[in-house]
């Protein structure tokens, strides 16, 4: 991705995962690659939304349409963004996010320890509807 497409590394979990942003993007990451076993593979793709309201609204809509929550909603400490992940039927996950840190061209990638605390400041494990009493349209 870096050599062939021009993605830039934003941050990393050394030897474990890489946060990459597309050419011209100032979002913290558009793609996250995670090493699992002996392979490096696709973990998730991120879709940037305008604000936390769209993350929650979109997340509730996806839930109503039968998409299974992987994790979220929640907030990442590395990018400061709000998130909601959905299991992708083809593998990996799709992430709705908003309010990510603005990454300048002079950004220097940082190395982080991989831990639950570095992944999420807070998060719901099964989506917000379960905890809030929100009607999702399912009976």
Locate each region found by the language model.
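Core segments of cupin and vicinal oxygen chelate
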Residues: 1-28
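Well-ordered beta-strand positions
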Residues: 10-12, 34, 85-87
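Short beta-strand micro-motifs in enzyme catalytic cores
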Residues: 16-18, 43, 80-84
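Histidine-centered active-site/metal-ligand motif
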Residues: 27-29, 44, 75-77
